């Protein structure tokens, strides 16, 4: 029987609080990645910091229900990160962000031992990866990282050389040129999501394109 690949997502989490409905949902890039990976048949764990409030329980309980390992989540006295979100014409609009206990997050020695068991470690730009991704990389652990549209953030310069696969959100022209420039910063493979234009990847030799799947959007 084939072994399930094991992914550990590390970094930010938050409660996405929708102001119109006054409802909160688990969110954060690494949180979402861990859930998607289990949906695809892999094993996943999440490492990050949550507070001792209802938001922390929401994050942990939600991940458990999706079969994500939460054994290395740090529960810290204080508030869980919260993003307030509005819906306008069917699109999400991010209003403000309170980082809460994630502001001081970094990985522990116990976390590092756990990360060494992973086939891949993934992170995102809001999770203070500059504090620990260089060490993860130096230990030879395969890494992927989502820079969103913050690839010129000062922290990104520290992380680029430590990443095998880099993801970006990009809405400018000449996506191919953009991926070439990003790959020069260190990653072996660069992937840009392009909204309605799908996505594009570049491995230094060839470009790969993927379109979108049209779907009906409920604008209520």
Residue positions per predicted region:
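Substrate-binding N-lobe of the ribokinase-like
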Residues: 3-83, 88-89
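Short active-site-adjacent structural elements
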Residues: 17, 54, 199-202, 219
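Ribokinase/PfkB-type carbohydrate-kinase core domain
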Residues: 2-8, 62-64, 70-74, 88-215
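Alpha-helix N-cap/helix-start motif
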Residues: 19, 56, 156, 175, ...
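Short glycine/threonine-rich catalytic loop with a Thr-x-Gly-x-Asp
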Residues: 25-26, 30, 214-220
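Ser/Thr-centric signal marking residues that sit
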Residues: 80, 193, 220
